[in-house]
Amino acid sequence: MSWQAYIDNLIANGKVDKAALYSRAGDALWAQSGSFELQQPEITEIAKGFDSAEGLQTSGLHVQGQKYFLLRADDRSIYGKHEAEGVICVRTKQTILIAHYPSGVQPGEATTLVEKLADYLINVGY
């Protein structure tokens, strides 16, 4: 399956409306939905946030120019929220998966789907 197919399948469920897959270092975009592409400082901020959440705790999480309130940050997952929408970032062995859910979607439903895809990627060596 191509990287793009993973993103397309994630979007098809209706719980996530935008997603992208980056290299673990955040230096290469592997797949994306539509125009969901982060600016380099945004993906760098996320990539560093997995190792140290201090910067995210201080200044928030930024995705496509929007600031999200940091809900959780550890070495695997970063969650952010802005009003009724949110962002889920999960780091695997070789990738960073970033997904956005719109208002009207329960955060737990979107999070479960994104985390399951990350688990799958980890299990197949990515």
UniProtKB/Swiss-Prot annotation:
PROSITE patterns: PROFILIN
Biological process annotations from GO: intracellular transport; mitotic actomyosin contractile ring assembly; positive regulation of formin-nucleated actin cable assembly
Lineage: superkingdom: Eukaryota
CDD domains: PROF (cd00148)
InterPro entries: PFN, PFN_euk, PFN_sf, Profilin_CS
Keywords annotated in UniProt: Actin-binding, Cytoplasm, Cytoskeleton
Cell compartments where the protein resides: Cytoplasm, Cytoskeleton
Annotated SUPFAM superfamilies: Profilin (actin-binding protein)
One Pfam family recorded for the sequence: Profilin
Keyword Cytoplasm set for record: yes
Predominant localisation class: cytoplasm
A GO MF label: protein sequestering activity
PANTHER family linked to this entry: PROFILIN
Family statement drawn from the similarity comment of this UniProt entry: Belongs to the profilin family.
Described purpose of this protein according to its UniProt entry: Binds to actin and affects the structure of the cytoskeleton. At high concentrations, profilin prevents the polymerization of actin, whereas it enhances it at low concentrations. By binding to PIP2, it inhibits the formation of IP3 and DG.
Subunit structure: Occurs in many kinds of cells as a complex with monomeric actin in a 1:1 ratio.
Protein name: Profilin
Organism this protein belongs to: Candida albicans (Yeast)
Designated gene of the protein: PFY1
